[in-house]
Amino acid sequence: MLNVVSKTIDLGDGRSIKIETGKLAKQADGAVTVTMGNTVLLATVCAAKDANPGCDFMPLQVEYKEKYSAIGRFPGGFTRREGKASDYEILTCRLVDRALRPLFPDNYHAEVFVNVILFSADGEDMPDALAGLAASAALAVSDIPFNGPISEVRVARVDGRYIVNPTFEQLERADIDLMVGATMDNIMMVEGEMDEVQESEMLEGIRVAHEAIKVQCKAQLELSEAVGKLQKREYSHEVNDEDLRKKVHDECYARAYEVATSGTGKHERGEAFEKIVEEFKAQYTEEELAEKAEMIARYYHDVEKEAMRRAILDEGKRLDGRKTTEIRPIWIETDCLPGPHGSAIFTRGETQSLTTVTLGTKSDEKLVDDVLNYTKERFLLHYNFPPFSTGEARPQRGVGRREIGHGNLAHRALKRMIPTDYPYVVRVISDILESNGSSSMATVCAGTLALRDAGVQIRKPVSGIAMGLISENQGKNYAILSDILGDEDHLGDMDFKVTGTKDGITATQMDIKVDGLSYEILENALEQAKQGRLHILGKIMEAQPETRDDLKPHAPRIEKMHIGKEFIGAVIGPGGKIIQGIQEKSGATVNIEEVDGMGVIEISGTNKPCIDAAIGMIKGIVAMPEVGETYPGKITSVMPYGCFVEFLPGKEGLLHISEVDWKRFETIEDTNLKEGESINVKLLDIDPKTGKFKLSRKVLLEKPEGYVEPQPRERRERREGGREGGRNFERRGGDRDHREPRG
């Protein structure tokens, strides 16, 4: 028997969300369906009973998958089957993971798998905004330990009005697009892009989102109570020795605090911290360490964390010796590589990005074929994080989720600065060569520099900064950190990235690890971030006051032209013959498409002459021949009665033997005209029925003195008469124009 339980959430605008459990996937630890309109997601959670031996972290795995059948489509590819996760699916996984992960108990180390699947969609409501709610609700109806519930919503500002979970159409018109994850009481995660908005406007969007989330969390608690899952399973994943914990603290804390306040570099500081714990472990035998090593590592990590936090809260001293508002030293180099179309190095402290820009044509557009999004992207940003950037000795595998997420943040920070009518496809590639925190923000800064070096006329330069937080007593005592290090991110309470121009914010990403973060702290963090952003922007402008006024010599050139829709077929030709010929003859690349009832042609090449040649050929094709005009032409074939001349691309006319010269020729061979020869011709007439062109060469030549116009051919007169009175003229022999009638 089914025991179906459901709750409905009213969004207050005529729409509602239904959460249901007890019908599908009943063997999972928890399973719910979330329905909004015709959009249906299934979320399931399963957890191992015991932790893996030696595991000291939260092994959470979140998967999000969209079925093409949800919208009635076939997948692409040879197999016609869903394959590896798309970038969009990976980004949705990360949004859910970042909101859930901090709320599992610190000492819970069993593997947890969260799967969210889109089974139905209508192309109107956005399913990624429901994935966090679905995942949390599945945990709520399970017995897996979880300090939730949470929910996630998207908030967009459209025409000055904040909308919760907007439609695809509404989002296209929004100047604020925020995804917010939160519990009933606290913001946990924020990510979004904006069109140069003020800090207060972004905060208002977060407030609107949190109010909607509170309603959704309440519905989950009611659902959990209805299915009797308020009591969670018992577990014991850590072995503790309180005497050992105290011993580690007593013997290591003072030395760790000294290292935390020494102001040394990343590797020197790491070695100093490592030396302390190694000397502590030296007092134990190998047999004792086999039992205690894992606990010692865990307790010493807590000592390091406490030392760093106390140094900041009590003395205002950071690990590298900076003040809380201080930005690391910055050095910049642009035009550093001869091959790319644009390049820049941005180094901030021990974080360095080498970023390049490649300019391409329409054929370089990226085709996006997601379930609910079929489009082409003209601005790409790729972020690479090789192991050597942190000094790690391990192989470099494929692109990971972290790289996709960091690249997406930098992409959103810069994309609104690319002019909408920019003719080039732009690819920005950031290779992180050194990393000690804020590498995604270094990518934004280096991306701005490289784009300007490439001659891309971006609307405004963009800079970015990562902020941190150290707090205690529910946020009553706190310190906000500008331009955080990797250790400050790891040991702190917040990672808050903000990008923007001098006029406002373009993108943000925030992850909070503690309860009780007030809006006052967020306001202060945003204000401090603004000061940091503007400082970094000043350094960028010092190094590169202006955008390069032209592209580099080896960058492709692009010209656009518009033609009537009716000429598109003529330019392409049968089987693409004409357009391929244009490309072969000119050396340029030609792309054509119909836009708003017009043919839009993009001509690109490595130099201006090849582009001009292609443009000339296209103009010739679309040009309308005018009677009386003179055209340069080329003889394409020679016939007994005259020559065919191509006087415009794709347009041929007959040059009759009688129109070659004022002189009379008996045969076409007497004219000495050859196939392939170039001559000038004048268009005499266009047949109104057949559209055939009648050409003349002789009218362009000077008429000989004493020239007498030939008399009308007798043959034609007699032939007309013959049609009335019979065929009585001689067909054989004699001059063609003076044939004698038969006896």
Curated annotation (Swiss-Prot):
Residues 628-698 form the S1 motif domain. It comes from Porphyromonas gingivalis (strain ATCC BAA-308 / W83). Residues 704-743 are annotated as: Disordered. Residues 556-618 form the KH domain. PANTHER family: POLYRIBONUCLEOTIDE NUCLEOTIDYLTRANSFERASE, POLYRIBONUCLEOTIDE NUCLEOTIDYLTRANSFERASE 1, MITOCHONDRIAL. GO terms for biological process: mRNA catabolic process; RNA processing. It is found in: Cytoplasm. SMART domains: KH, S1. Its main location: cytoplasm. Mg(2+) binds at residues 489, 495. Its EC number is 2.7.7.8. Gene3D superfamilies: GHMP Kinase, N-terminal domain, K Homology domain, type 1, Nucleic acid-binding proteins. This is Polyribonucleotide nucleotidyltransferase. Belongs to the polyribonucleotide nucleotidyltransferase family. Pfam families: KH_1, PNPase, RNase_PH, RNase_PH_C, S1. GO terms for cellular component: cytosol.
